[in-house]
Amino acid sequence: MGQTLSEPVTAKESSYCQNSVFRVGSSCMQGWRINMEDSHTHILSLPDDPGTAFFAVYDGHGGATVAQYAGKHLHKFVLKRPEYNDDIERALQQGFLDIDYEMLHNESWGDQMAGSTAVVVLVKDSKLYCANAGDSRAIACVNGQLEILSMDHKPNNEGESKRIIEGGGWVEFNRVNGNLALSRALGDFVFKRANKKPEDQIVTAYPDVETRKIMEDWEFIVLACDGIWDVMSNAEVLEFCRTRIGMGMYPEEICEELMNHCLAPDCQMGGLGGDNMTVVLVCLLHDKPYSDLIARCRNSNKTAFEQEAGTATKTTQSNDNMAETQTSSPTTSPNSSLITPSEATNNSEEQKKLEKEAQDPLLAASEMQLNYIY
C-alpha cells in the first residue's frame, strides 16, 4: 500500500448523465491516499460514432499522468482503428496498444514511471464489449444475477506468471519483480523493454475482451477500481447496488454510499479500504423511465429490501476471506434522496430535466461532452 494521510479525504466528485438507454452515476474519492490517481470516463454517445456509449475506470499508480491521459484519449485511439467498423474486439485490443505506444514514444513524457489499469465497457447496437488490463473490474446484474465481465490480471495467475518469466522478469511476493501488484497495465514502461511484441512484455497493455448481447433483463453494470473490489466481493457489490436501486436512490448516490461503506475507519487495516476509490454505475433503462428499474429491483428483491430497511445483522465474506459484521439498516448521506417509483418521475425539477433528456438523447449527449472526464 502507498503512503497514507493522517485523516482520509472523503470529499467526493460525483456526476450523472442520462438518455433513453442509460442512467449513469459516478463518484470518486481520494480516501487515505496522499494523492488522487484515478480517472474515469462516461460518454453516452461518442462524437465520432453517435449512439455508441463508452464507460471506463482507470486506476493510476506512481502518479496520475497515465490514468488521466487514458481517460481523455483512449476512446479516440479505439475509434480510429481501421478494424473498428467490422471488429470492435480487435479495435479495443489494438487501441490499448496504440495509446501505450504513443505514451512510450512521446519525448515530452520523459522517463515516465507511472502506470494505470484500464477497464472499459463499450456498448454499440445492444452489444457490450468489455476490455480490461489490470485489476480494475466490471460486473453486470442480469435479472438479479451476477454476470462477470472481466478477470483481474495478477502476477501469480499461471498465464500471467508464464509471460512475466518468459519476458525476463520474475514474480516475488505476488508482485512483478517484487514491485508491481498487477501484471497488465498502461504505462509502467520499465517493464516493457524486452525485445518482444507488446503483448509479450513483462507487463503488457494488451487487454482481454469479453462480449455480451444486452437483453431486456439486463439491469445495471458496475465498473470500479480495486479500492472497491479489495473490500467487497462481486456478489456483495451487486446486492448493495440492487437493493439501493430498489430503495429509489440515484446511481451517483449509490456510488457515494458504496465508497463510504468500503472506506477503512483507520489506516491500520493492511491496505483494505485505504486506496483511492472510483465507481461508475450504469443503469440500463431500455427506453423506459428509471422508475421502472426501481420497481423491478424492489419487487424482485423484497427480502433483501426488507432486511436493508430493518436492523438485522449479517456476516459477509470479503475477497480475502476476512469475515466482517455489518448492520443492514440503510446509511444515507445527507444529500441522498429516497424516492418511490411514482415519485421518481413526478416530484423534482431534476427529474423533469432527466425526462427531457430521455426524450432527446442528443441533448444529453451534447451536455455530457463538456464534462465526461473525471
Please report, for each region that a protein language model flagged, where it lies by residue.
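PP2C/PPM-type serine/threonine phosphatase catalytic domain
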Residues: 1-374
